[in-house]
Amino acid sequence: MSRVSEYGVPEGVRESDSDTDSVFMYQHTELMQNNASPLVVRARPPAVLIPLVDVPRPRSRRKASAQLKMQMDRLCNVLGVVLQMATLALVTYIAFVVHTRATSCKRE
């Protein structure tokens, strides 16, 4: 008879490494050698949600408001530069088209 550890799991039995399983799977060494299916012992405890990104939170509303205002100012500056570049590109394109049409009309 096999010995039982302090957690109630027989020796030679290990926990599955897969996080996608919905149950804890304990596999006995002999079962693994004989290519037999693993034994399901008990259900998995509830999962703990871990945030993907740890965003530091300001301690006060005033700091949060100031941080939000600073981010909005940066965003507005970037959008302003993008709008200026798009306007410049459009004006340049229109000037090029007008110039090419004017020169092609003179040739005829």
From Swiss-Prot:
Intravirion side: 1-77
Cellular localization per UniProt: Virion membrane; Host Golgi apparatus membrane
Annotated membrane topology: Single-pass type II membrane protein
Main subcellular localisation: virion
PTM comment text: Phosphorylated.
Annotated keywords: Host Golgi apparatus, Host membrane, Membrane, Phosphoprotein, Signal-anchor, Transmembrane, Transmembrane helix, Virion
Cysteines engaged in disulfide bonds, as pairs: none
Family note: Belongs to the varicellovirus ORF1 protein family.
Name listed for the protein in its UniProt record: Structural protein 1
Organism for this UniProt entry: Varicella-zoster virus (strain Oka vaccine)
Source taxonomy: Viruses, Duplodnaviria, Heunggongvirae, Peploviricota, Herviviricetes
